[in-house]
Curated annotation (Swiss-Prot):
Name of the protein described by the UniProt record: Flavin prenyltransferase UbiX
Gene: ubiX
Catalysed transformations (reactions): dimethylallyl phosphate + FMNH2 = prenylated FMNH2 + phosphate
Keyword Transferase attached: yes
Cross-referenced InterPro entries: Flavin_trans-like, Flavoprotein, UbiX-like
Domain of life, per lineage: Bacteria
Originating species: Deinococcus radiodurans (strain ATCC 13939 / DSM 20539 / JCM 16871 / CCUG 27074 / LMG 4051 / NBRC 15346 / NCIMB 9279 / VKM B-1422 / R1)
Binding positions (dimethylallyl phosphate): Y159, R175
Binding site for FMN: G17, G18, S19, S43, S94, A95, G96, T97, R129
Keyword Cytoplasm: no
Amino acid sequence: MSDAPSGPPRLVVGVSGGSGIPYALDILRALRGLDVETHLVVSSGAKRVMSAEGGPQLADLTALASVVHDDRDLAAAVASGSYRTGGMLIVPCSAGTLAKVAHGFADNLISRAAHVTLKERRPLVLVVREDPMPRPMLQNMLAAHDAGATVMSASPGFYHAPESLGELLGFVTARVLDQFGLNAPGFRRWREDEA
């Protein structure tokens, strides 16, 4: 997170229209606990998913964010490369958002901020959740990777013997935060007790 300004680290958190909003909530909680300044952008598709799934709602996410931006605001601070951040994550990252990132199509703030993150060579993490993955989606993952993004699946491990949904979410959260050099407190790593 070397490109972040002095003071607390700063990350952009995009939430797009794939199922998996609880991952975004867990990551925002962890980032708040680590005193990371978060700039939240939630797509209209994500808002529809929240309504349909009945899990975490927009107010739950915005309560944990430092700053909330409208996805239609292409003049927001995070739309400019001169606004320094330590990177961006999109969780969940829908197939449509993945395609936009992979091909440089920036028609909303999430895709514009992702484009800026790539052009400034800052870490960009895309957490995809959709299954199965058709060939175009796999090609878009490769294109996003080749452009500089890290593509991760929202797939928890089980070697830490999770006993709750929170522990499953926490596994993915910890792996995402690893990409930014941040440690999720309480995360049990593979064979860590043997080191």
